[in-house]
Structures are given as C-alpha cells and as structure tokens.
Amino acid sequence: MRTVLFGAAVLVALLAAAPSPRPGAVVHIRDDAFVPASIAVRVGETITFVNDDDDAHTATADDASWDSEGLNQGQKWTHAFAKAGKIAYHCTVHPMMRATIVVRSAS
C-alpha cells in the first residue's frame, strides 16, 4: 500500500512540475491573409490560428518544423513555441499568404 501511495505521489509531483504552454496570441486567417502578418510571442507561449475565411488554409513553418494541416472555416489550431527566433510561415494551399513570428526569450 505504501508503495502505491508513494508512486502516486511521485506521479503527481512530476505532472505538477511539467511546464505547460502559456496562452499567447491569436492569428486570424481572413481574406487570404494572416492577420496580423507579423506577431511576437515569448518562449513557452502559444499562437492560436483561427480560420475565418471561406477557403481551407494551413499555417506552415517555412522550415517545415510545424504545420497546422488543413483548417476549414471556423477551425482553430494552437502551437507552442519552444525556442527563440524568427519564423517565416505560409499557407501551403495559397503560397502567396506569408507572415512572420518573432519568438523572444522568456525572461
């Protein structure tokens, strides 16, 4: 019984210590554009991409490190950013749709 309780306590402690993404920003997809076209977040924060357009779109990093896959009208997709840097991204369905994310250090 003590072993089970100890194991459960360790599991709870590990889950509590695990970092969880912090809410960040929202990028809307409308009129074949990302709005805003440039946005900044901090390491550990998220961006939620919301498709407000009639057409399906993606939000895809130029370096292919992340991809929302197809988002239909009204669908959302959230991504957490783990390292600082400048990220260019685009829509694979409409390559002329381009935007930039600046991820700043958490401090």
Model-derived features: positions:
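Extracytoplasmic copper-binding redox domains, predominantly the cupredoxin/blue-copper superfamily
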Residues: R2-S107
